[in-house]
Amino acid sequence: MALVSPIPAMGERAGSMRFHGIGSPGSRSSRSGIMDEPVSRLIDEKIFVAVDKHVAKSKSTLIWALQNTGGKKICLIHVHQPSQMIPLMGAKFPVGAVKEEEVRVFREKEREKVHMILDDYLRICQQRGVRAEKMFIEMESIENGIVQLISELGIRKLVMGAAADRHYSRRMTDLKSRKAIFVRREAPTLCQIWFTCKGYLIHTREATMDDTESEYASPRPSISASDLLQTFSTPESEHQHISRVQSTDSVQQLVSNGSSTEQSGRVSDGSLNTDEEERESDGSEVTGSATVMSSGHSSPSSFPDGVDDSFNVKIRKATSEAHSSKQEAFAETLRRQKAEKNALDAIRRAKQSESAYSEELKRRKDTEIAVAKEKERFITIKNEQEVIMEELQSAMAQKAMLESQIAKSDGTMEKLNQKLDIAVKLLQKLRDEREELQTERDRALREAEELRSHAETSTLQLPQYFTDFSFSEIEEATNHFDSTLKIGEGGYGSIYVGLLRHTQVAIKMLNPNSSQGPVEYQQEVDVLSKMRHPNIITLIGACPEGWSLVYEYLPGGSLEDRLTCKDNSPPLSWQNRVRIATEICAALVFLHSNKAHSLVHGDLKPANILLDSNLVSKLSDFGTCSLLHPNGSKSVRTDVTGTVAYLDPEASSSGELTPKSDVYSFGIILLRLLTGRPALRISNEVKYALDNGTLNDLLDPLAGDWPFVQAEQLARLALRCCETVSENRPDLGTEVWRVLEPMRASSGGSSSFHLGRNEHRIAPPYFICPIFQEVMQDPHVAADGFTYEAEAIRAWLDSEHDTSPMTNVKLSHTSLIANHALRSAIQEWLQHHL
C-alpha cells in the first residue's frame, strides 16, 4: 500500500517517487527541539473526506463536509485501485505479460490522473475558502484501504458517501453502499463517521472508546506533533506500505547534587528520523533531543543552584525552535503544493501546444495539397480556354456563313407564317372538339360510377369461398410445408410460397390452437370474398380442412421490408413512396365508403402492405378488421388489438373503432415514408423539426432528393392525421385525397426522367386482362367482380362455362358491364407511355 501525500516531491517523480506527509519537518537548522503540539490535536483539527475517482459522484459529499466543518481544515483521502490490464498496441494485456518498464510508465500515468482528479476537488474547496490537502493510497480493495487509513493515521472524523446519489430518497435511513457498510463495521470505534447521500446526512456512527483502543485514543503526553511526521514512498511493487517514525525515550543521564540518599531525574534523548530523501543526501540521521525531569523523592532544594533556570531556558529555546520549525514546514508545504500545481499546468500547456502544433502541421499540409490542386485546375482551365478560343474563331467563320443563309430563310419564313395561321385555326377547332370529348368523358365516368355500385351490389351474391382446395393440394403446393418455402411467420401462423394449379400463390396456414385463429380465418374469408380493388390483396381460395388461405403471390415483399432495406433490397424512391401513399389512401376510401359492407381495417401498418413486382401496393391481413354500423359511424369492440405505435389512442381507451382510427394509422405510415424512421414517437420528432425548420434533416436520404414544398405539405398532412382527438383528423376521401392525387400525378411526370425506358412502359396490373395477360382495350366487368377483356370473357362464356375464370365459383349471371372509367384510364396511359 502506498500513501501519497498532498505535497509531492517534484524532483523525484521520474524515479522512486517520495511524498511528504501531513506535517512536514522544519528546516535543517531548527530540527532540534520539542514540538509541543500533541498528535490528537493535529488529527482533531481536520475533517477527512473519502472521495471517488469520479468528481460528480463525491461532489455532494464534499460540499456537505465543507458546509459542516465549522472552519476546520479538510483532508481529502482516496483509495486508488491499480488497473490489472495494461493497454498496449490497441489491446489490453495482464500485468504479468508486460515489461516492468511499461508497467511503471503506465502506473505513473495512473497516478498523474489521480492527482488531477484530487486537484479538481481541491479547487472546489478553494472556491469556498476552505483550506484542504489531498492524500491517496493504492490498494485492490477500496473499503479495506479506507479502514487502513483510519487505523494508520488515527483519523477521528470522517465523511463518506452512504450510497450513490441515484439511490437517495426521503425515506432513506440506512446505508446502501457495500463499502459504507463495511467501513461502519470494521473501522476503529473511536472514529466518528458521517455518511451522506446527495447532500443529505443519512447516518452517523458516533465515536466510542473501549479498552483495546485506549492506547490509540490517548497518546502519551511526551508524543508531540513531530511524532506525526511520516515518510510516504511509492515502492516498486504493486502493493504499498505506510511507514511511520516514532520517537522513543531512553534513559541517558542521572543528575544528582552529590548526596547518596537523594535521587534525581534522568535525561532522555528522543531521536526522530527525517524522510529518506534527506538521509540519502546527508548520510546521517537528524536527531532532536529533549530533557525531561522525572518526579523523584528529592526536594527542589536538592538541585544545585541555577539548575532550574538552566532547564527553563533550554525548554523555552526548544519550544521556540519547534514552533519555528512548524511554521517553516507549513510554508514549505505551501511552496511545494504551488510548485506541483505549476508543474502540472506546465505539462498540460505543453501537451496543448504539442497538439496545436500537430494540428497546424496538418492544416499546412492540407493547404499545400489544396494549392497544388488549384494549380492543376488553373492549368486545365487555361488549356480549355485555348481550345475555346480556337472554337470561337471557327464559330465566327460559321456565323458569316449562317448570316448569308438567314437571308435565304426570310422568304421561307414568310411562307411558314401563312401555314402557321392555318394551323392556329385548326388548333382552335381541335380545342373545341376536346372540350366536347371531356364533357362526354365526365358523363361516362358518372355512368361508370353507377355501374360500379351495381357491380358491388352483385358481389354480395357471391358464395362464401372462391375455391375450395383440398389439404393434399396444399401439401403438394408447399412440398409438405418445406421450411425453405416459408416466407413469413407470426402468432397467426406461417406463410408459404407455392405452386397451386400452375399458379404461384401465397398460402397462409393459420394456427388452429390460437384463440383468434378460427375467428381471423372466417373474418378474412367473409371480407375478401366480397370485394375487389386493385390495392387490396386478392383471395384466390381457401382450405377449411387445414385452416389455410390462398392469396395471390406478391414478390415485392412488405412495405416494412422495403423501408428497412431488408436483405439488401433497394430503397424506395420518393416518387414511389408518394404513389404508394396515394394507393393506400384509395384502398381505405374504398373500405370506408363501401355502402354494402363498410369496414375499418384496424391493424394498418407497413408490415400489412404488400408490394408486387411493379411496386404496386395492396392491403392485406383483414383478420382483425371490424364491420361498421349501418350508419357508418363506429364499430364497438372490447378487444381492440394492433401494433401500439400505429394504434389510435382514442380507440385503445374507448374500445370503439371508427374510420378515423385508420386515418391515424395512415398518418404514421406517411411519416415513415417521409423519414424512414421507426414509428415510435415519430410524430413528435417531425413536429419538432417543422417548428425548428429542420425538416430537411429528418427526411430519408435513401429516397432521393425530396421536393421540399411537397415534403413539408405531406408532413403537415400526416401530423393532422395523427391528432389525438379523432374529430380533428382530416377526411381521407375529401381532404387527404385532394392533396395526394395531384402530388402523385406531378411526381409521376417528373420521375420518368429517372426511370429506365422499359420500367417506364410497364402497365399497372389492373390494366392487364386476367385471361389474355395483355393490356385491355375494351374492359368489361363480369358477375364475379373481375374486369376482363370483352373478347376474352365472351369466349369463356360461349364455351359453355358458367363459373368464374379467377375463382372457379359459379356466376350468378352472364351479363357484362362495360368499364368506361378503366377504359379511359388505359387510353390515357397508352398515349403517354407508348
Swiss-Prot record:
InterPro entries documented for this protein: Kinase-like_dom_sf, Prot_kinase_dom, Protein_kinase_ATP_BS, Rossmann-like_a/b/a_fold, Ser/Thr_kinase_AS, U-box_ubiquitin_ligases, Ubox_domain, Znf_RING/FYVE/PHD
Keyword Coiled coil among UniProt keywords: yes
EC number assigned by the record: 2.3.2.27, 2.7.11.-
Catalysed reactions listed for this entry: L-seryl-[protein] + ATP = O-phospho-L-seryl-[protein] + ADP + H(+); L-threonyl-[protein] + ATP = O-phospho-L-threonyl-[protein] + ADP + H(+); S-ubiquitinyl-[E2 ubiquitin-conjugating enzyme]-L-cysteine + [acceptor protein]-L-lysine = [E2 ubiquitin-conjugating enzyme]-L-cysteine + N(6)-ubiquitinyl-[acceptor protein]-L-lysine
Keyword Transcription recorded: no
Entry's Gene Ontology BP terms: protein ubiquitination
Protein kinase domain mapped to chain residues: 481-744
Record's protein name: U-box domain-containing protein 33
Provenance organism: Arabidopsis thaliana (Mouse-ear cress)
Upper taxonomic lineage: Eukaryota, Viridiplantae, Streptophyta, Embryophyta, Tracheophyta
Gene: PUB33
